[in-house]
């Protein structure tokens, strides 16, 4: 269960962070010929439909209510806090790819936000011009030549591939929340962090899920292309 929640966070952060930076029409035009190893496309399409329904009838209504009763400054503080917890993973990922400049900037971000940002509640690093450099164990393996394997859509967790799925257990143990006892508290904290981040992206997700022709190929190619870009 622990692994599922942290992987849920990482996978969806990857997809929605990329989608936020891209115009949907531009993406479709640029990556329409992108090739993905997808031998289980029938299953993947069905699981994508399941995940969309789960979002529409489960996550979205709950998060709409959460947004209505929770002040934005609280949500933003929580967002910054959980993002700061991922900084050590980004630091390690960049070091293992020999991206020392990026790793150094991640270290500075973590130090600035932890010390001057009240434990990460405030993102002072961005105001100082320090940028994030996404990296994780999956991008490390990709950087050193490990292929992605076949594409797979996981129940609830969403798009992934064989390589990234196999890194999820190790990824979990690089997270501070992995060492919180009891286990239910660790799961609850991770789930809240994911849900809070998602609460900022409901309009974007609605746009992608309900206004994108050929949704499954779009999500599949977005995920695989973004992962490849991060490994360079």
Predicted regions and their residues:
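Short low-complexity stretches enriched in small and charged residues
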Residues: 41, 109-111, 174-176
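N-terminal targeting leaders of membrane proteins
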Residues: 17-102, 188-232
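Surface-exposed interaction patches
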Residues: 120-127, 140, 145-231
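Mid-length scaffold segments of soluble, non-membrane domains
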Residues: 81-159
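Bacterial N-terminal signal peptides that target proteins for export
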Residues: 1-6
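Bacterial N-terminal signal peptides
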Residues: 7-15
């Amino acid at each position: 269960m622990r692994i599922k929640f942290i992987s849920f966070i990482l996978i969806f952060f990857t997809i929605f962070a990329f989608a936020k930076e891209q115009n949907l029409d531009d993406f479709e035009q640029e990556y329409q010929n992108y090739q993905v190893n997808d031998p289980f496309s029938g299953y993947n399409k069905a699981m994508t439909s399941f995940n969309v329904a789960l979002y529409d009838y489960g996550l979205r209504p709950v998060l709409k209510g959460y947004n209505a009763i929770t002040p934005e400054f609280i949500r933003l503080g929580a967002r910054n806090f959980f993002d700061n917890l991922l900084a050590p993973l980004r630091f390690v990922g960049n070091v293992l790819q020999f991206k020392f400049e990026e790793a150094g900037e991640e270290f500075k971000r973590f130090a600035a936000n932890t010390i001057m940002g009240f434990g990460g509640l405030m993102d002072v690093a961005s105001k100082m011009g320090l940028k994030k450099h996404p990296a994780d164990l999956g991008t490390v393996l990709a950087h050193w030549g490990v292929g992605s394997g076949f594409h797979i859509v996981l129940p609830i967790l969403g798009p992934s591939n064989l390589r990234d799925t196999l890194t999820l257990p190790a990824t979990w143990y690089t997270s501070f929340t992995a060492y919180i006892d009891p286990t239910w508290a660790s799961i609850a904290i991770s789930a809240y962090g994911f849900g809070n981040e998602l609460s900022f992206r409901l309009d974007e997700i609605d746009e992608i899920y309900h206004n994108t022709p050929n949704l499954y190929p779009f999500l599949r190619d977005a995920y695989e292309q973004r992962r490849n870009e991060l490994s360079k």
